[in-house]
């Protein structure tokens, strides 16, 4: 269906941005911010823990009180905004705070994607999971490849392109009806 195609495009865009971010953030912190590898490890550990906590606490609350499609739209926009803030901020603390916000929203976004797509599948889980994994793989490969090629051209370019890709995915997602998943629950 149209909504399923939109969601698969969103998955591809999300994994493009996420992988581009993951491929670039370590180099950016070390090369541009001149912070040591021990800081990078500590930062990534803190970010992972915060994402885990956000996923455990906010994802069930948001899903309980709001329609999943609407939450997914808002979080998709927040992902684009947080990446955009990373581009704008020259201050190290503000840049890293934006990175934390991005990864926290990303950790909430993944279960929402999976839930919406599962509900849109109409019981055809096996083949749909194959298509879902292909969408993820396309995003991961292209995100990593592009980030690697363009980082030397501009160290914030991977974040900029990721912000734009996610913004385009948000715009594509706008026509989705917020009730689209409720009528498809098996």
Enumerate the predicted regions with their spans:
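Structural signature of the two symmetry-related core transmembrane helices
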Residues: 70-85
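Intracellular juxtamembrane helix-capping segments at the cytosolic ends
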Residues: 108-121
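Conserved extracellular-gate-facing transmembrane-helix segments in secondary transporters
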Residues: 13-22, 106
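Helix-to-loop junctions at the C-terminal end of transmembrane segments
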Residues: 54-67, 151
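A late C-terminal transmembrane helix in Major Facilitator Superfamily
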Residues: 124-153
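Helix-loop junctions at membrane interfaces in 12-TM secondary transporters
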Residues: 87-98
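Multi-pass alpha-helical transporter architecture, strongest
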Residues: 162-186
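Short amphipathic helix-loop junctions that connect adjacent transmembrane helices
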Residues: 23-39
